[in-house]
Amino acid sequence: MSDDITSEAQTIAVGQLRAFIERIERLEEEKKTIGDDIKEVYAELKGSGFDSKVVRTIIRLRKKEDHERQEEEAMLQLYMDALGMS
């Protein structure tokens, strides 16, 4: 009886593991599809005359809180001033 319980538990664990792996694989495929879609949008953006590098910077900055962005901009300005770049 103990062996039956162990075998059943092992079967359940294997099933759970397989389900997790399959979910991750599906999500990875979705992530790839989304990445491809984003590349297409950047290509359209570039084709319309926009600078994709600048747009990427804007997107990165928009993800930050205002105070984080202001702090980063202040540090950038400080470093540029120190190097005589402003």
Swiss-Prot record:
Organism superkingdom: Bacteria
Protein name: UPF0335 protein BAB1_1765
Species assigned in the record: Brucella abortus (strain 2308)
Disulfide bonds: none
Alphabetical list of InterPro entries matching this protein: GapR-like (IPR018753), GapR-like_DNA-bd (IPR046367)
Pfam family, any one: GapR_DNA-bd
One Gene Ontology molecular-function label: DNA binding
UniProt similarity note: Belongs to the UPF0335 family.
